[in-house]
C-alpha cells in the first residue's frame, strides 16, 4: 500500500512539474514578446505616426484651397490618426492616408510608396525640380529606377487587367495585350513592383486569361530596369506608325507623358522626319501623365511657312511646320492635367475632331513632396482655369465618343480605329474637319 501511495505521489509531482514548466515557458515567451517584438511594433507604430503627421501638416500648409474644399481638415487628423498609428507597414499607412486625402475630393492629391510604379514615375517627372537631393538617400546606389514590364493595370471586380501597354516595352514585345487578366507571376499573385524586383533581364512566367471563358495561358516576359526619366520618351518614339488605308498614309504618335518640353521637341522632330510624308495624323494623348503647356498646340495652329529643299539631282523635300494637314486628337479618361488643356484648345481653335472618351477632369497644378521615410506625397498646390473655365471635375468630352471596355478587350482598340477613320474623313472633306 505504501509503495502504491509513493508511486501515485511521484506521478502527481511529475504532472505538477510539467504544468509549472509550461507556465514558466509561457511566461518567458511573453517576456520575450514584450521585450523584443513589442518594442519593434511600437517603433513601427511610432514611425508610421510621424509620417502621417508630416503628411497631414504638408497638406495643411500647402493645399491650394485654404478652405480645403469644404472639408474640416483638423477633424480629418482626429479621424485617421488612430488608424495610421496602427499601420504596420508603409503600404498599410498608404491605405489610411489615401482614404484621408480622398476626403478632399480633388485631383493631383495622392500618397505613394515604393511599392507602386507611379512612385518612380512621379519622382522621374520631378527629379530635376527639387526632389533629387531629398530622394537619393532612399534609392539603391542613389539611382532612380525600378524593374518592370511597362504595363498599366486596373482592378475591376476584384480582378487585375492590363489597361495600357507602353510601346516597345517588355510587355509589348512579349505579346501581352490590353484587356488581359493577370492571374499570377511565377505562380504568385501579381504585384506591380514586387513581382519583378528581383528579375531584371530574367524571364518570368505570367499567367493570363484573354477571354472570360478561355483557358489560362502562360506568357514569358523579361522585365527590365526602367528609367522613369526616359521611359516615356522611348515609348513615344516606339509608338510612331505610318498606317496605309484607302490609298492614304495616316501618321500616328502616342504621347505617354507631356511633363517636359523634350516630348514636344520629339513630336516636332517626328512631324518633320518620319511623319513628314503622311496625309494626316492621329495625335494620341491617352493615359500616362499630363504636364503639357498651351504652346504645344502651336504646330497645329500657328501660320505655316512652306519650305522646299531641292537637291543637286533635282529631288525635292518639303518641311511644313506648323502642320497644315488633317489631325485628330485621341483622348480617354486617362488623359489628364495639361493634356486636357490641349484638348480644350484643340476644340477652341477648331484644329480637328477629338475622338475617344471624356478626359479625366483632373486639372490642378500638382507638386511632389518627399516624406521622412522616402515616400512621396503628390499634392494639388494651385487651382487652374482655362479662359475662365475650371475643368477640374468636368473634363473635355470628345466630338466622337467611342466607348471602350478594358476587361478581355483582346488588344482591340476601337478608339484608335475610329480616329484613323476620322482622319480619312477629314482628308476626303477638308472643309468639314
Each language-model region and where it sits:
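N-terminal secretory signal peptides that target proteins for export/translocation
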Residues: 1-16
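Extended, small/polar residue-biased N-terminal targeting/export presequences
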Residues: 68-157, 213-239, 430-431
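Terminal peptide-recognition signature
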Residues: 55, 100, 151, 171, ...
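Conserved PDZ fold ligand-binding element
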Residues: 171-193, 282-283, 346-349, 354-356, ...
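PDZ/PDZ-like domain segments forming the peptide/carboxylate-binding groove
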Residues: 133, 140-191
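Bacterial N-terminal signal peptides
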Residues: 23-35
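Cleft-lining beta-strand/loop regions that shape enzyme active-site pockets
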Residues: 200-372
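PDZ domains, with a preference for the canonical peptide-binding region formed by the helix
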Residues: 86-92, 172, 176-214, 268, ...
Amino acid at each position: 500500500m505504501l509503495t502504491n501511495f509513493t508511486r501515485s505521489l511521484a506521478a502527481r509531482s511529475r504532472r505538477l512539474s510539467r504544468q509549472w514548466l509550461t507556465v514558466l515557458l509561457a511566461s518567458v515567451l511573453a517576456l520575450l514578446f514584450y521585450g523584443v517584438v513589442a518594442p519593434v511594433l511600437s517603433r513601427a507604430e511610432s514611425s508610421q505616426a510621424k509620417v502621417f503627421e508630416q503628411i497631414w501638416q504638408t497638406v495643411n500648409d500647402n493645399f491650394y484651397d485654404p478652405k480645403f474644399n469644404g472639408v474640416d481638415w483638423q477633424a480629418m487628423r482626429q479621424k485617421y490618426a488612430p488608424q495610421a498609428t496602427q499601420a504596420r507597414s508603409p503600404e498599410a499607412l498608404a491605405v489610411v492616408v489615401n482614404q484621408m486625402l480622398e476626403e478632399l475630393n480633388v485631383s493631383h492629391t495622392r500618397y505613394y510608396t515604393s511599392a507602386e510604379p507611379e512612385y518612380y514615375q512621379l519622382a522621374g517627372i520631378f527629379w530635376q525640380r527639387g526632389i533629387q537631393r531629398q530622394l537619393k538617400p532612399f534609392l539603391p546606389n542613389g539611382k532612380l529606377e525600378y524593374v518592370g514590364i511597362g504595363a498599366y493595370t486596373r482592378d475591376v471586380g476584384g480582378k487585375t487587367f492590363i489597361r495600357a501597354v507602353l510601346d516597345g516595352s517588355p510587355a509589348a514585345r512579349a505579346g501581352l495585350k490590353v484587356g488581359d487578366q493577370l492571374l499570377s507571376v511565377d505562380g504568385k499573385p501579381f504585384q506591380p513592383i514586387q513581382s519583378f524586383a528581383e528579375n531584371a533581364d530574367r524571364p518570368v512566367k505570367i499567367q493570363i486569361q484573354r477571354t472570360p471563358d478561355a483557358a489560362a495561358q502562360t506568357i514569358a516576359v523579361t522585365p527590365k530596369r526602367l528609367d522613369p526619366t526616359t521611359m516615356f520618351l522611348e515609348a513615344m518614339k516606339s509608338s510612331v506608325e505610318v498606317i496605309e488605308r484607302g490609298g492614304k498614309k495616316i501618321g500616328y504618335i502616342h504621347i505617354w507623358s507631356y511633363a517636359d518640353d523634350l516630348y514636344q521637341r520629339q513630336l516636332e522632330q517626328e512631324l518633320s522626319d518620319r511623319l513628314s510624308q503622311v496625309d494626316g495624323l492621329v495625335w494620341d494623348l491617352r493615359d500616362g501623365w499630363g504636364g503639357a503647356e498651351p504652346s504645344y498646340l502651336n504646330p497645329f495652329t500657328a501660320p505655316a511657312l512652306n519650305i522646299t529643299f531641292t537637291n543637286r539631282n533635282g529631288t525635292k523635300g518639303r518641311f511644313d511646320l506648323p502642320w497644315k494637314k488633317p489631325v485628330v486628337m485621341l483622348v480617354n479618361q486617362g488623359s489628364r492635367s495639361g493634356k486636357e488643356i490641349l484638348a480644350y484648345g484643340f476644340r477652341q481653335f477648331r484644329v480637328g475632331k477629338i475622338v475617344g472618351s471624356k478626359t479625366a477632369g483632373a486639372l490642378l497644378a500638382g507638386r511632389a513632396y518627399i516624406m521622412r521615410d522616402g515616400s512621396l506625397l503628390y499634392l494639388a498646390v494651385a487651382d487652374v482655369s482655362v479662359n475662365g473655365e475650371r475643368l477640374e471635375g468636368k473634363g473635355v468630352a470628345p466630338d466622337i465618343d467611342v466607348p471602350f471596355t478594358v476587361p478581355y478587350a483582346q488588344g482591340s482598340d476601337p478608339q484608335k480605329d475610329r480616329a484613323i477613320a476620322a482622319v480619312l474623313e477629314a482628308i476626303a472633306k477638308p472643309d468639314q474637319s
